[in-house]
Amino acid sequence: MSLMDPLANALNHVSNCESVGKNVAYLKPASKLIGRVLNVMQDQGYIGNFEYIEDGKAGVYKVDLIGQINKCGAVKPRYAVKNHDFEKFEKRYLPAKGFGLLIVSTPKGLMTHDEARNAGVGGRLISYIY
């Protein structure tokens, strides 16, 4: 059986592991997009270290959880957003203004919605976390 959305599955697994109090989550299958999303989450202080483990198939990410995530998930469909329209999606996906972040895929790479707004670029919404 194939996964329809590996990113949504990975973020849901992280959220579930965080809610039951686990210290480590193993995300399988691994992909470049999942790795980049984990990198943004680590830069913003939501997760600890993570590492890629080769298992002879698609690979596994081992993620150290630090108890900072209340909820995270993928945005479906992946809306195209202009740099001045982020506030509408903040109201939809985040509980309060200035709390949490949206992860956006831009021509300059994956970044948070605040970084994209400051850089003056738009993109597609990938996920949310708070």
UniProtKB/Swiss-Prot annotation:
Keyword vocabulary terms for this entry: Ribonucleoprotein, Ribosomal protein, RNA-binding, rRNA-binding
Q: Which residues form a coiled coil?
A: none
Any one Gene Ontology MF annotation carried by this entry is: structural constituent of ribosome
What InterPro entries does the record point to? Ribosomal_uS8, Ribosomal_uS8_CS, Ribosomal_uS8_sf
Q: Does the keyword Aminoacyl-tRNA synthetase apply?
A: no
Domain of life the protein comes from: Archaea
Extract the PROSITE patterns matched here: RIBOSOMAL_S8
Which processes are annotated in GO (biological process)? translation
User: What would be one Gene Ontology cellular-component term for the protein?
Assistant: ribonucleoprotein complex
Q: How does it assemble?
A: Part of the 30S ribosomal subunit.
State its role: One of the primary rRNA binding proteins, it binds directly to 16S rRNA central domain where it helps coordinate assembly of the platform of the 30S subunit.
The Swiss-Prot or TrEMBL record describes its family as follows: Belongs to the universal ribosomal protein uS8 family.
Q: What is this protein called?
A: Small ribosomal subunit protein uS8
Organism of derivation: Methanococcus maripaludis (strain DSM 14266 / JCM 13030 / NBRC 101832 / S2 / LL)
- This protein's gene is called rps8
